[in-house]
């Protein structure tokens, strides 16, 4: 009876992230009541770096804090600067508490902040909003 030979793990190529040389781009900040997500893109919209309050180590209700948004923006900004990013136009979406802090911390990381636009979608009286909380 022949013994089955151990086949070892299939060899996979490790793709190293290539350094994109993008000087100017866009920072899209989506700030909800539960989380803040920052995506930094090149002018055509291809994502260069991103971070959220969850990816930088916050869980549960701490993700919705301004401090979590600050840490996420710093992480995304640092990663974008590694690809040569120097200037960003900011697009803010959503009603969350991390909007202003995220913009401020993108500037603190060393990115030059261009025009800031609020692109929060406003319904023409669409869906019924969630009921009011009674505490």
UniProtKB/Swiss-Prot annotation:
This protein's UniProt keywords: Ribonucleoprotein, Ribosomal protein, RNA-binding, rRNA-binding
One of the GO biological process terms: translation
Keyword match Kinase: no
PROSITE patterns assigned to the protein according to its UniProt record, in alphabetical order: RIBOSOMAL_S11
One cellular component (GO) term of this entry: ribosome
GO molecular function ontology, one term from the record: rRNA binding
Signal peptide bounds: none
Lyase keyword on record: no
Gene3D superfamilies registered for this protein in UniProt: Ribosomal protein S11 (3.30.420.80)
Subunit structure: Part of the 30S ribosomal subunit. Interacts with proteins S7 and S18. Binds to IF-3.
Cross-referenced PANTHER family: 40S RIBOSOMAL PROTEIN S14/30S RIBOSOMAL PROTEIN S11
Functional note: Located on the platform of the 30S subunit, it bridges several disparate RNA helices of the 16S rRNA. Forms part of the Shine-Dalgarno cleft in the 70S ribosome.
Family label: Belongs to the universal ribosomal protein uS11 family.
Protein name (Swiss-Prot/TrEMBL): Small ribosomal subunit protein uS11
Organism this protein belongs to: Cutibacterium acnes (strain DSM 16379 / KPA171202) (Propionibacterium acnes)
């Amino acid at each position: 009876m022949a013994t089955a030979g151990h086949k070892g793990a299939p060899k996979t190529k490790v793709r190293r992230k290539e350094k994109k040389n993008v000087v100017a781009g866009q920072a899209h900040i989506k700030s909800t009541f539960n989380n803040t997500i920052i995506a930094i893109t090149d002018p055509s919209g291809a994502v260069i770096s991103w971070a959220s309050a969850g990816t930088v180590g916050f869980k549960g209700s701490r993700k919705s804090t301004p401090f979590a948004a600050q840490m996420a923006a710093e992480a995304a900004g640092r990663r974008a600067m590694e690809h040569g990013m120097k200037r960003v136009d900011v697009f803010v979406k959503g009603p969350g508490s991390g909007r202003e802090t995220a913009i401020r911390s993108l500037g603190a990381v060393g990115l030059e902040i261009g025009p800031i636009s609020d692109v929060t979608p406003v319904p023409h009286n669409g869906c019924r909003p969630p009921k009011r909380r009674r505490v």
